[in-house]
């Protein structure tokens, strides 16, 4: 008989000397401030930030959505620790002016907090 166990998820920890953003629900690290591209985005629940890279985030399947800036293929992203949906990842932009978003991540402000080194 084989005993089934839940796979252990290992969290990434960002350097404590940098300003960072964490999940508001469980405090898992999400991104360094240095990876912030823009604060001028709109999520489904309000303001959102665009990041170049994130950690401790899982990705759902991509789907086409008509967003404020046109049609994009996006995948919902979620905190790997508490499984809260945080925003989405831009998989593909169909308009040339939006190509810079490909591979980037949107995290809604309602799901993250500033952590460490903010004065």
Swiss-Prot record:
Kindly indicate whether the keyword Nucleus belongs to this entry: yes
Q: Where in the cell is it found?
A: Nucleus, Nucleolus
Looking at the record, the residues that make up the Yippee domain are: 19-116
User: InterPro entries from the xrefs?
Assistant: Yippee, Yippee/Mis18/Cereblon, Yippee_fam
Q: Which residues bind Zn(2+)?
A: 23, 26, 79, 82
Q: Which one GO biological process term can you cite for this protein? A: spinal cord oligodendrocyte cell differentiation
Principal subcellular localisation of the protein: nucleus
Which molecular function GO terms apply here? metal ion binding
| Keyword hit for Zinc | yes
| GO CC aspect terms | nucleolus
Pfam families membership: Yippee-Mis18
Its function, per the record, reads: May be involved in proliferation and apoptosis in myeloid precursor cells.
- Cross-referenced PANTHER family, in alphabetical order? PROTEIN YIPPEE-LIKE CG15309-RELATED
Q: Name the family.
A: Belongs to the yippee family.
- Its name, as the record gives it, is Protein yippee-like 3
Recorded source organism is Danio rerio
């Amino acid at each position: 008989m084989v005993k089934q166990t839940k796979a252990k998820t290992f969290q990434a920890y960002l350097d404590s000397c940098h300003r960072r953003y964490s999940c508001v629900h469980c405090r898992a690290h999400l991104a360094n401030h240095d990876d912030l591209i823009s604060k001028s985005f709109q999520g489904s629940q309000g303001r959102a930030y665009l990041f170049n890279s994130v950690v401790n985030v899982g990705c759902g399947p991509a789907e086409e959505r008509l967003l404020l800036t046109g049609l994009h293929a996006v995948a919902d992203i979620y905190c790997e620790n508490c499984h809260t949906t945080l925003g989405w990842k831009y998989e593909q932009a169909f308009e040339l002016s939006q190509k810079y978003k490909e591979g980037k991540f949107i995290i809604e402000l309602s799901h993250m907090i500033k952590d460490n080194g903010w004065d």
